Amino acid sequence: MIMTAAIICMAGIQMMAQPKLPYRNASLPIEERVSDLLSRMTLEEKVGQLRCTLAWNYYDIKGNKVVPSSTFMKDIAEGNIGMLWATYRACPWTRKSLATGLTPTLAAKAGNALQRYVIEHTRLGIPLFLAEEAPHG
């Protein structure tokens, strides 16, 4: 038990000692951060940032909580997604209403849950662009 605790502490100390990657360092100039991030991205990741998917099925409501759906987790694991569209929509097209979809409070929780998942479960942790009517420019 003591050995396990010591190993966990050492791993935590080692992780804290690692320097922050330039693209994650808010004190650096934006141009330097962007250049660093682009140099780390694969072609697939760059193309993936242009990918926009319909997202009204990317969350599950569990009481007063919202969590990423298994569909969302699968899509994130299988490929790069840079933008979600229609995440918050309630209309006949999505078959969601304020009763079956997201209230304003749940919409905020959904956005946070999806962003957190992508940041924590992708290689570079690039946040999503969330939009409702972005296709019009």
Locate the predicted segments by residue.
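N-terminal beta-rich core of secreted/periplasmic extracellular enzymes
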Residues: Q18-G137
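Bacterial N-terminal signal peptides
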Residues: I2-G12
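Bacterial Sec-dependent signal peptides at the C-terminal "C-region" and cleavage site
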Residues: M10-K20
